[in-house]
Amino acid sequence: MTNTQQPLGTGFTAASTAADVLAGIDLSGRDVVVTAGHVGLGLETTRALSAAGASVVVGARSPARAAAALAGIERVEAYPLDLMDPSSIEAFAARYLDSGRALHVLVNNAGIMGGELVRDARGYESQFATNHLGHFQLTLGLLPALRAAGGARVVSVSSWGHHLSDIRWDDPHFDSGDYDGMIGYGQSKTANVLFAVELDRRWAEDGIRGYALHPGGIVTTNLAPWLTEEDWRTMGLVDDTGQPVIDPARDMKTPQQGASTTAFAASSPLLADIGGVYLQDNDIAPLEPFTEPVRQDIAAGPLETTVGVMPYAVDQEAAQRLWALSEKLTA
């Protein structure tokens, strides 16, 4: 496997904010879509890209709630989007294409994490359906607009959580039982990276580049509402008063810091001729020196992450295999 995971030495750090990486970058005239761009990291991403001049369409299950959250941000609107509902995804893509706009940046940001087993109407495990398959269908639906941009980027917000599981090729939907929500999350985050790898291989000649990234650990996003404050404290992510611990060097970030790598992937000229890579802390992350998934027990103590991507998440053959599986599952 050719190792494309070579850090660039960008000059940015884990403490850099979205405003830092966008300084001096003018996104005027650029059209962007951000899924769940009205909450958590998505909201910070929308705010930062808009401040740089971009026009943003936010995909949200409740456009009214999204509009309230987005009040005061310029050049932004919300379309209804439910990533577990194929008809909703199709309608979103059709509405965007009907607008006649090109699409310069697609940020596949929405995600869910852990919890009990939930299935969509097709019987698919909800995290794989939402975090990967929904975005896969959406991206393919928006392909004409991406091509029309004459140079576009598809940014998939993955996670260090991809270290928790490779793709469960024989049972991606846990039909055999023994469900583990964090394994399901890890699988979906690995899928995000593999999707970026194969998308870039397929579409780079059309000027469409793919990126995946780990934003960092951000407690305030409400990504996992099933976790209690005690769980967060055990993982070392909140202090004794319940306040988030902010320590970028240990991957504990503010929302503004967490949105920085998304903004970097969406806009940095340093990535102009690079794609199909996994980013972390506003740079290309190195390959991890180990190959087996990490076992994490929330109750075992402070969560420790590393700077790097698992080899199985950037394997080109696996990426092609996942694309074929995804086409089958979304047909």
Where are these regions (language model features)?
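N-terminal Rossmann-like NAD(P) cofactor-binding module of classical short-chain dehydrogenase/reductase
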Residues: 33, 104-107, 128, 155
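Glycine-rich, N-terminal phosphate-binding loop of Rossmann-like dinucleotide-binding domains
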Residues: 36, 110, 131
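Short alpha-helical oligomerization interface
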Residues: 116-130, 177-179
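Short alpha-helix in the Rossmann-fold core of NAD(P)-dependent oxidoreductases
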Residues: 117, 128-139, 155, 188
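Amphipathic alpha-helical dimer-interface segment in Rossmann-like NAD(P)H-dependent oxidoreductases
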Residues: 130-150, 166, 200-201
